Amino acid sequence: MDYITEFKQRHLRRAQLKQLSILEEIDRICRKHDIEYWLDGGTLLGAVRHGGFIPWDDDIDIAMTLDDSRRFAEIAPNELRSGLVLQTPETENTREPIMKVRDLNSFYVEGNEDFSLDYSKGLFVDIFPFIPYPNVSRSFCKRYGKAMSKCYSILHHSHQYSWRATFELFYFGAKFLFCKSVWAAAFALRKCDTYISNVLINNGYGIMHRRDCVFPLSTIEFEGKRFAAPADPDAYLSDLYRNYMQVPPKEKQKVHAVFILPDLIEEAEVKK
């Protein structure tokens, strides 16, 4: 085990507990203002399969409807406790089109972090906005959802000036507009009363969930506390991972982050 890997493993649990405290703060605000959220992705998987964090996981994912995420964005800046900040594409020059609640007294580096952009890089909870989807086939969603998300990611990634970069901008720009028009037609011609999922530019795997597997929300235990969860976690996780109860082999049990530092300043010093 190299030094960086050993360092991450040594600090992982402290980072997880700090992220748990961020989730508790989000939960407090949502309860106070009747905002619905639910555990999503690997966090929901961890709750079902492990009763908490997946042992090697280093982030927390939750979801909200787009309307509730907008309400949260209005309320949270004035409600979050000291040391936490709401990060959005409107408040900081981030590379991702999602909201995060960040801890300012920590440092977290992802593999594709962009250090040319000035934005907070502390531990976080991801908040994914969900929208109703048209009643289309899952294969349609996978084909055009993945394509649109990939094009968006490439178009918003840093590029060096070259003939290849210029070609990519034109090619993926045209492909993005085509996929966007296909989706616009689907939204216009089909009802949107059966499925719900991440906004299109975030739906890199082309996933759709039935609304009745999400609502009405339930609760689930995560690290000894109860948080909101989809109505049918089994169906929800099957959409995402298929055989989700199967633990991956040891060589795939890797921390996502390149580097984690849970505390920039020790808490005792902060309180002085």
Q: Residue locations for each model-derived region?
A:
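Conserved catalytic core of two-metal-ion nucleotidyltransferases
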Residues: Y3-H33, A76-N135, S153-Q160, R164-L240, ...
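A short secondary-structure junction signal
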Residues: V136-R143
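Aromatic- and glycine-enriched beta-alpha-beta binding-site module
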Residues: P132, Y144-K146
